[in-house]
Regions:
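A generic structural motif
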Residues: 56-61, 140-143
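A glycine-rich dinucleotide-binding beta-alpha-beta segment and adjacent secondary-structure elements
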Residues: 27-31, 78-142
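Flavin-binding catalytic cores
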Residues: 11-29, 60-99
């Protein structure tokens, strides 16, 4: 589960307008997830991890950590006092870490219909490949980035349907 923190619609729109103008938003629209609630190996016993991000201009090197923490603190007072450790990555560092994150885009790049059904080659079932038993799933397959888990779900169903017929 992912929670979105930004305030009312005007505050959300202002944050996204700033990014569109090439500015780092003062009050970003923040997405947070606490994966350790569902996967206990992500944090020591009795502790939790929090994963978060916000939109910034393409290629930004500005550290948004303080602004993100300030937004979370608005909705969860005392949050900062509970932080034991933190790590942040700029878009440039994200791209260096994973070349698929072009410009730091964690959604796998532009989502265009013609691309979604031609990766890696044109196919009716975009998760299958010409190689038997090889399927792909990621933010670069339908329904695209931001629909957490659905790319893998659909790829698994495609694999089961195809493999069960053979």
């Amino acid at each position: 589960m992912t929670a979105h923190l930004s305030g009312d619609i005007e505050q959300t729109a202002a944050a996204e307008r700033a990014v569109a103008k090439g500015e780092n938003p003062k009050r970003p629209h923040v997405l947070v997830a606490q994966h350790s609630l569902f996967d206990p190996i992500r944090a020591p016993e009795g502790k939790h991890s929090l994963w978060t991000y916000c939109h910034v201009p393409n290629g930004s090197t500005f550290d948004m950590t303080d602004r993100i923490e300030t937004q979370i603190e608005r909705f969860a007072p005392g949050f900062r006092d509970r932080i034991l450790a933190k790590s942040a990555m700029s878009p440039a560092r994200l791209e260096k870490y994973n070349p698929n994150n072009i410009g730091g885009d964690i959604s796998g790049g532009v989502q265009e219909m013609r691309q979604l059904f031609t990766r890696p080659v044109p196919r009716i079932v975009p998760y299958s490949t010409p190689l038997r038993g090889l399927y792909i799933c990621s933010a670069s397959t339908p329904p695209g980035g931001g629909v957490h888990g659905m790319c893998g779900h659909h790829a698994a169903l495609a694999a089961l349907r195809r493999d069960m017929r053979q």
